[in-house]
Amino acid sequence: MQDWRAALEEYYSRYLDSALVLAIVNDSDDSNTAREILEALSIESQCDSHEEHWDNLRRDEQELLNLKTLDEEINKIDEEDFTWELKDSSLELDPDVYNFLRSMFSDLSAARVQLVQAKCQNDLVRSSDELLNHRAIQESEQIETAADALITSNIGHRSRQRKKKTKKATNSRKPLSKFQSNTEEVNEDPILKPSLSVWENNRLLIEKLTSILNIPSSQINHEFYKNSSAWPITIRNLIHRHQPLSNITNNELMKYQEEATQLAKDTGLSLKICTDVLICSNDYKNALWILCLIKETQHNEMGNIKLSSQTAKSNSSTQTKTCLNDQSSKLVEDDEALSAEDCNRLAEEYLELRNMQYSNSAKEYRRSKSNHLFGGSAMYHAQLGREYHEKALKYRSLAMRSLAHSGTSHSLDLHGATVREAKTIVRERVAAWWAKEADTSPNSIRPFVIVTGRGNHSIGLEARLLPAIVRLLQQDHWRFDAEHGQITVYGINRHSKLNSNA
C-alpha cells in the first residue's frame, strides 16, 4: 500500500507543496482518488502561477515607467551649489561629497558639516552616519529640555522646604573591582521588568541575546520553548553550540581566564560556563548581563539549577526528535563512495526527517495563535524541513549518478530508478556503448543488455520501466528485442531511420 503513496508523493511534490501532497495521499483510501485530487490541484496551481507571472510582469513594467518619470522630474530640478562655502576653508574637502552632505543636512551649520567631513576623511558613508547621530542627539536634547521646562513650572512651594541633613554611610576605601562596578550598572536596569508581562519580558530578552550572540531569534525561540521556558538551560545549550567555541585556540583561551575567574568568583557559577559565555559574547559587560540573567532566572523560576555537563532529560517525544536529528548529523559525508542503494536509503531517511519537521512546524504554528513566540519556532522547523528536502533531492541525484555508472560496458540494471531517471541513464549508456561498437563489423557487435524488471514492485504490479524504455528506443531508432523484463539492443535500425527521414 505504501508503494503507490510514495510514487504519488514523489511525482506531485514537484508541482505542489510536499506537506499538502503527503496529507492528501495519507487521507485517501485508493490511488485513483488521490491522483484525481492531486491532478486537479496541480493544474490549478500551474494556471495560478502563469496568471501571477503575467501580473508581476505588468506591475514591473508600470513601476519601471513610474521610476523613469520620477527620474525625469528629478533631473529637471537644479541642485543648489554649496561649494562656494569652501573658498575660505583651510580643510582639504572633496567638493562633491560636501555638496551632497550640505544639501542633505541643510538644517546643520556649514562649519559642523565641514568638521565632520574632515574628521571622516571625505568618506561619504561615515560622514552621513556621524551627521545623522548629531541630528538625533539634538532632537533628543530638545525633547528633554521641553520636558524639564514643564516639570519645573509645576513645582510646588513644599518642594523648596529645607530638608534635614542625613549622614551617609561611610563606605570602605577599598577600590571597586571591574566586576563590582559593572554589576552596579547592570542592577540599575533590572533584567526582568515587573511592569511588563511575561511575554514582553521574554521578547526583550530574546532580542538582547540575538544582538549579543549573533544567533537568529527563531533559533533562540525554539530552544527556549523546547526547554520548558527555562533560561539557564536554554543559554547553556545555545552557548554549547555556538561557533566561536569550536574555533578557539589555547592561546586565546588563556586571555579570558582572568576575567572568567573573577566572574565565577562573584556570581557563584562554574568557571566553565563563565568562560564559555565570555568567549561567545566577546565582551565583559555582555557576558556579565548573560550571567546575571542565568542567576536571576534560576533563582526565580527554576530554583537551584546547576549548569553541569548533563541537563535534565526531556520527555519521550523530545528524545525521539533529538535522536533523529543526531542520526541525520551522523549520515555519511563521503558522497562519492556511496552506492545507489545507500543513496536511496539516505534520501528516504531525509524525507522522514523532512516530514517530521513539517509536522512540528504545523503544531508550532497552531500554538502561535495563542502565543506569538511560537511563530519563530514554527519558522525554524519549516527551515529545517526545507534543508532536509534539499538533502533528500541531493542523495536521490547521487543515486541516479551511481546507477548510471553501475554494471558493465555492455549491461545496465535499472532496478530502483524512476521512469524519468531511467530514460536519462539509458540514453547516456546506449550512446556510450554504440560509440565503441559502431566501427566493428555487424557480426562482431556485442549487444547491450538492459534489465528493467517485470514490475513486481510497481503500483498495481504493472511494469512501467519496460514500456517506457521500449518507446524511448523506438523513438531513437534502435534495433532491439524485449522480453521477460530485459531489453537487448543490437544497433541502429537504419530502415526505420530512412523511413522517418523520407
Swiss-Prot record:
GO molecular function, one term: endonuclease activity
GO CC, alphabetical: cytoplasm; nucleolus; nucleus
Region annotation (Disordered) ranges: 150-184
Listed SMART domains: SMR
Residue span, Smr domain: 411-459
Single GO BP term: nuclear-transcribed mRNA catabolic process, no-go decay
Keyword Isomerase belongs to the record: no
Keywords: Nucleus
PROSITE patterns in the record: SMR
Compositionally biased tracts (Basic residues): 157-171
Subcellular compartments: Nucleus, Nucleolus
Protein's name according to its UniProt entry: Smr domain-containing protein C1235.03
